[in-house]
Structure formats: structure tokens, C-alpha cells
Amino acid sequence: MKVLIVLTSHDQLGDTGRKTGFWLEELAAPYYTFKDAGAEIVLASPKGGQPPLDPKSNEPDFQTALTRRFEADAEANAQLARTVRLDSVSQADFDTVFYPGGHGPLWDLAEDRDSIALIESFIAADKPVALVCHAPGVLRHVKAATGRPLVEGLQVTGFTNTEEEGVGLTQVVPFLVEDELKANGGHYSKGPDWGSYVVRDGLLITGQNPASSTEAADVLIRQLTIH
């Protein structure tokens, strides 16, 4: 099993002057879920190299056993420091792709032509795609084979409007994930704020928030083993 994990290269939180990037738990949890299942993992980002970590995601309140494991893992950190460029990867080399969130993807991956084409290619090849938290927002321009939005008519979830309000960034983000999924015709559902909630519809797996990262990765592995 070979898994591609796609991370953001964007580090500016709108015009706030604050830093953003990927959310550590949303990388660490699937990374070890896949690694412990024996998968080969490749990390990619639009710019390649070291992707920006949202500094808030490594504060004590947001650390988990898996984020601490990642922080202490020299091999994982070396791999993170040298992510491959997104425009150099091919769907044909992987069984699946997983997108961690953090606010960064709303600015770069959501508009990135290589990312859009990559997701479309995985779906066309009948391979599952998983995205958690803000990452379902990167589906905003992704099309199905029909030319319609990929999420149209599908069961989906993602970071809720109330969760965005809870972190005080409703007026900062370029769009709200919940609203965007609904606008593209997705059948959006959600669980309680900050609790694990994962939805699978065919090849598409979406998770609501950081707490959903492990469950989303588990669902993805099950999908691969029965697919």
C-alpha cells in the first residue's frame, strides 16, 4: 500500500500578520495509522521542501500522543523537511491520497491546478480520496467526470461554521468549508463541534475536524482493503 499525503505550502493567515499552515494532529494521526499498517508514505506540497506548521497546532492544549510521537521521530521529521513538489507526483504511483487540513489549504490547495487535477485523477482511477477538517475545502473546484462538482449529491463533512466561529476566523478565511460544500451541492452533515465525525460516500472520505483524523485514516484503510 502506497499513500500520498498532500500538505499546504501557505503560511500567512489572511491579512492578520499571523502564521498558519498545516495542523500537526491532522498529519501525525494519519501518518502513523498508515505507517503502522505497513504502508509506504510519500509527503508532497505545492512548493516542496519543508511545509509550514501552524504554530498553534503544536501548543500544549492541542498536542496528542501522536503529535508527540511525530515530534520525536527523526525519520518522520526528515521526510517532512523534504516533501516532494506536488507537480512531480502521479496518481498512478499511489493507491490513495490523504489531505490534512489546517487553514493553509484554503488559500493554496483549494486553487492549485495540480491538486485539483490530482484528485480528479484519483477518482477517475477508482481510488479513494480522504480529506479532513479544512481540507475538504480543496474540493471546491474539483469536478466529477460529468463536469459537475465532485461533491454534488455526495455525503460530505468538513470544518463547521460554528467551529470556525469558535476559533475566531470566520471573517479571515477566504471561504467557509461548510458553506462551500453545500454551495457545490454536497449533502453536508456534521457531528458535535470538536468531536470525531467521518463520512464516506463511494470513493470520497471526509472528516470534520482534527479529532476526526485517525478515524478518517482508519476508514480509508478499510476502503483500500475491501476495494
What does each model-found stretch correspond to?
Residues 128:
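Active-site cofactor/cluster-binding pocket
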Residues 1-125, 137-227:
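Extended, subdomain-level signal for the structured scaffold at the beginning of enzyme domains
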Residues 133:
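Catalytic, metal-anchored helix/loop core of enzyme active sites in primary metabolism
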